Amino acid sequence: MFKIVSKYVYSDIFEVIDSANSYEEALNLKHEYELSFMSAYTIEIVEA
């Protein structure tokens, strides 16, 4: 399982915003969130 984690640019707080069962699904979700949030957030994939 993989977690999609976001971090607001002006803060050090991380938040789990979604999860995925496969790495490929996690990459797709990460891409969608990056398109939605633009540069306001850093989006990362973390293996759980």
Descriptions of predicted regions:
Residues 24:
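Acidic phosphotransfer microenvironment of two-component signaling modules
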Residues 2-7:
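A short beta-strand micro-motif
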Residues 18-20:
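Short hydrophobic alpha-helix segments
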Residues 13-14, 27, 31-48:
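Short, mixed-charge low-complexity intrinsically disordered segments
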